[in-house]
Regions:
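Exposed loop/turn and edge beta-strand positions of beta-sandwich/beta-sheet ligand-binding modules
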Residues: 5, 57, 496-498
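Acidic active-site catalytic centers that drive phospho-/nucleotidyl reactions
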Residues: 6, 40, 199-202, 501, ...
Length: 573
């Protein structure tokens, strides 16, 4: 009977939710077409981005943001606003904020020929397939401008060149000159320089890094962008979006007209992702005001410039899914780079990653011009990549004299914590074993914990030679992180007369707290049991349980673990 009542209540709540949604606009899940988004769906107005651009008018603007933060929709907004067409596209803006800004801004509406390319779906396994996709994209953009076929101002040769690329027939050299050619033809036809918009320009570059055709794609993109964006007399303005700046690869070599807006810059900081006000307005519209705190805990936490930002993809999916929280963002694309980082990380970096998993901040040098190969070649570049790709947030920024930054970074929210846990455990193929270890900790079964730890180390650690106590500390932090929904996990904090290794502070009253102390030796003659007993004695002598007791935790389990190579001995106090 209780189950039947609960089920009826769930059905009733779901029905109320669906009826409420039926009265309101639909949520734009996966909609990147501006006209469609503004006419048939709930649209968060980002049109003041146009005002900010026209106030400064940099020749070429590059916006670097994580995936699924509204880049494609914003670029299509720019296309619809600026593009000269037979349709009166001002109707899409007259009820938007940009239209209230005055004639200085609105006079630009519908006045420019526009070239628009998005590389977001160029994800092939070989260079040959990648080039075919790029050539097809170029061909489709030429076809979109079929007014050039009947243009009275183009020469026969220019029309021949148009048909070559429109017909998907050009070779690599022809396609590399595609932007330059199309901008020339449009300038000549309309009598006005054109705007070039390139969305997700670095998607095929990341794919090239992953699938070993990196030199080919970088060489192609360098020539492609140089022809269209560098010293091009047919260019009015250019816009690019991507995850990385990729400056060091000379893709934008010598392009002095390029202005980059990264996640650390104040410019355009509120236009990619949702602000707090925008999220609250959306929740109010759908009658879900009471869900703000939960939504914030899961999907807030990003900081672009000085603006606090929510993940827009996850916010929309959360509200659409009857406000049931889960990791929506992790299913939007591959996380191979995270796995690559975990596989190649040094023991020190592994320990830092586990600290992040436990909710701690770490200090990191951030280079927003990080490139994909550096993830393998320079281990400390991983924090730069994780930050710009959306896997970390900035807590504090300390500008450096070389133009880069020292930052305190942390995992932004619950959703990204799930992504880390999934990738960490999947990469070691030890998901179920790690869960068993966490269960052994929770059930205080030291014999089982000892056996599982040794099994885990044998199966998941390729080389233990030279590992120090910090390595095992980091490994244990990661395993304890699975208990994060039951415990607040602290590491290397002062308590009593010293600093404990790991503390598990229960989130629910009445549950036991845990103190861990680790010892390590390389000496084959050292008795691990005696070493583990020494760890327990240290917990007692140093009064590491002081903080737990001060917080009202009465049941405290002390665990001492001694490591040597892939062996462990566990003692419980």
């Amino acid at each position: 009977e209780p189950y039947r009542r609960q089920r009826q209540m769930c059905i009733r709540d779901r029905t109320i939710h669906m009826n409420h949604f039926a009265k309101n606009k639909s949520l734009p899940i996966g909609v990147s077409d501006f006209k469609l988004a503004t006419t048939g769906y709930y649209y968060v107005d980002k049109t003041l981005m146009i005002r900010d651009f026209l106030d400064k008018k940099p020749m070429v603007s590059l916006f670097t943001r994580p995936r699924r933060f509204g880049k494609t929709l914003n670029m299509d907004m720019l296309r619809v606003f600026f593009e000269k067409t037979n349709e009166d596209t001002s109707v899409y803006f007259k009820d938007k904020q940009i239209w209230q800004c005055g004639d200085y801004y609105t006079k630009h509406q519908g006045q420019y020929p526009v070239i628009f390319l998005t590389f977001k779906d160029v994800k092939s396994m070989t260079w040959e397939e990648t080039f075919q996709k790029i050539r097809r994209l170029i061909s489709l953009e030429f076809i979109r401008h079929n007014e050039l076929e009947t243009s009275s101002v183009l020469t026969a040769y220019e029309k021949e060149q148009y048909h070559l690329l429109a017909g998907d027939s050009g070779d690599e050299v022809d396609c590399q000159m595609g932007l330059q050619l199309l901008s020339l033809l449009l300038h000549k036809h309309y009598g006005r320089e054109c705007i070039i918009i390139i969305d997700e320009y670095d998607t095929p570059i990341q794919q090239g890094h992953t699938c070993n055709f990196y030199p080919e794609i970088v060489n192609f993109m360098r020539n492609f962008f140089s022809g269209g964006l560098k010293d091009n007399p047919h260019l009015a303005f250019g816009f690019l979006t991507g995850i990385l700046r990729v400056a060091k690869e000379s893709i934008f070599s010598g392009m002095n007209n390029l202005k980059t807006y990264s996640i650390l810059d104040d410019g355009y900081s509120s236009y990619f992702g949702f602000t707090e006000k925008e999220v609250k307005d959306m929740l109010r519209y759908y009658g879900k005001d009471d869900k703000y705190n939960e939504l914030s805990e899961w999907y807030d936490g990003y900081r672009f410039g000085n603006t606090e930002i929510f993940n827009p993809w996850s916010v929309i999916n959360y509200i659409s899914d009857n406000c049931f929280p889960k990791a929506f963002w992790q299913s939007t694309g591959s996380n191979e780079i995270i796995g690559e980082i975990i596989q190649t990380a040094t023991p020190e970096i592994t320990k830092d990653l586990y600290k992040l998993l436990c909710g701690e901040k770490i200090a990191a040098y951030i280079d927003t011009g990080v490139i994909y190969p550096e993830v393998q070649n320079n281990p400390y570049s991983i924090y730069s990549f994780l930050l710009v790709a959306g896997y970390l947030k900035v807590a504090n920024i300390y500008p450096q004299s070389d133009g880069n930054f020292m930052c305190d970074v942390a995992i932004p929210n619950k959703e990204i914590t799930f992504v880390y846990e999934k990738e960490v455990l999947n990469r070691t193929n030890q998901n179920s074993l790690a869960i068993s270890i966490s269960q052994a900790i929770f059930s205080k079964d030291t014999q089982k914990l000892q056996s599982l730890l040794e099994d885990f180390m044998v199966k998941s650690i390729s080389s233990i030679d030279g590992a120090n106590e910090g390595f095992y500390h980091g490994m244990m932090l990661g395993l304890c992180a699975i208990l994060g929904n039951r415990y607040k996990i602290r590491s290397n904090r002062e308590s009593g007369l010293g600093r404990f290794d790991i503390q598990l502070m229960p989130l629910t009253k009445g549950m036991p707290g845990f103190i861990f102390e680790f010892k390590h030796t390389k000496d084959e003659h050292t008795d691990l049991s005696a070493l583990a007993d020494g760890a327990l004695q240290q917990i007692e002598a140093k009064k590491y349980d002081t903080e737990l007791r001060d917080n009202g935790v009465n049941s405290i389990i002390s665990i001492g673990i001694a490591f040597r190579g892939k062996s462990a001995v566990v003692r419980r106090g």
